[in-house]
Amino acid sequence: FRSLDWHGSFEAYSDTKAKVYENTQVACVYNINDLATEKMVENADVQEGARAIGFTTGMPGRSQVGFVEDILCDRAFLDDRANSALEIATLEDLTNIGVLTPHLMANAAAATALARSYGVDPAEIKAALLKFRLDAHRIELVAEQGGIRWVDDSKATNPHAAAASLNSFEKVIWLVGGLLKGVDLNDLVAKYADRLAGAIVIGSERTQVLEALAKHALNVPVIEISAPENVMHFSVAAARDLAKPGDVVLLAPAAASMDQFKDYADRGNQFAEQVKIQLEQI
């Protein structure tokens, strides 16, 4: 929303983003499931010989990188791309990076497309994927017990990042809230309400979060943490009460942290610490 305010309109915002493809020499890599980006590539003024290379989390077509069952494949940079594909890595390989989410798969496919466009050997790409690790507090699995996963995405300090987290799991106990800095959560809550098995609301601007949940997720159990101290102790305890086997307790606050924590890392560390302490007591 702030980007749109800055640029004045969606069209101006889109035009600015599209400049990344201008004068491309080798390959315009784009998500085939994003029609706006595909249009940017179609309209881009590129150098002769530059190719449009799509990536997807699904089955790749010709000139695309994607997944055939559990294998990351290249169907763009080989001679017989009409009838065959090059294996790059498996989904099991990608689990070494972090929690296997749709956007992790998409990022791996995009990185593969970029690397292959410059002739990097498939074996070298696989080796790089096996070595790569996400930074802490980015959809990081903290613990798993009794069929319940506890995931730290404290780095999700805005609705866009929180949406990527919520989109990664089917049933979520959502730890949300903090310093909203004027951001409206109504669209986010409305879009992902059907994935919520519960919500734990923290932060100094809880009222706005509670109102969005009441409006768009009326049947979702909500617990407000109003205690000024030991916020994560009470939050994790509340999540334990709500969570059932198959649920993911997800810290993806969609807000900044400095109202109750030093920073997002402190928030994530306190979450992880309380999860481990309280799960040991079971």
Pin down the residues of each PLM region:
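Acidic, Mg2+-coordinating active-site environments of NTP-dependent enzymes
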Residues: 1-149
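ATP-dependent carboxylate-amine ligase
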Residues: 114-123, 127-137, 141-282
